[in-house]
Amino acid sequence: VPQSTIDALRALQANGVKIFICTGRPPAQMSVVLNTIPVDFDGIVGFNGQYCVDGSGFLEKHALDATDVATIVRWLDEHEDIVACIGEEDYVYFNHSNDQMRRTWASLGKTAPDVFFDDPHVRTAEHETFQMSPYISRDQEAELLSLLPNTRGVRWHPDFVDLIPAD
């Protein structure tokens, strides 16, 4: 982050303006980013807006629809080669790994969070899921979204799509 940006953020705070970091990342993966920016943010808007928190304890969150999550997990079962990143409030994991995922993760450099693997059948049944990011093509995205009435896709990278609540 350029020093001019850091100076500008600090000047805003000195003038009473609250600053938030807004990202598609989940709170559980924010420390690797926040550790590279020497600014104390007043809050986080994470998971593409699905999880918002500030330093005073305010929290607003909106998880994926449980029926849509179950449909996505079944779809992943039918497409065993597809890797997906699955985000909960305090934990982010992959269903498995492949070369495409490893290349993408390596491109994050020092902002790449730790990678964990888990069973989405178990985790999604026991924990709210805020975002699922399968490594799929645009055609596969259209196929999957046609099955999900309460979910939309947000794509900022050619290798994967972030699936978030539609509303």
PLM features per residue range, with description:
Residues 5-103:
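Active-site phosphate-binding/coordination module
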Residues 81-83, 87-167:
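Conserved acidic, metal-coordinating active-site core of Asp-based
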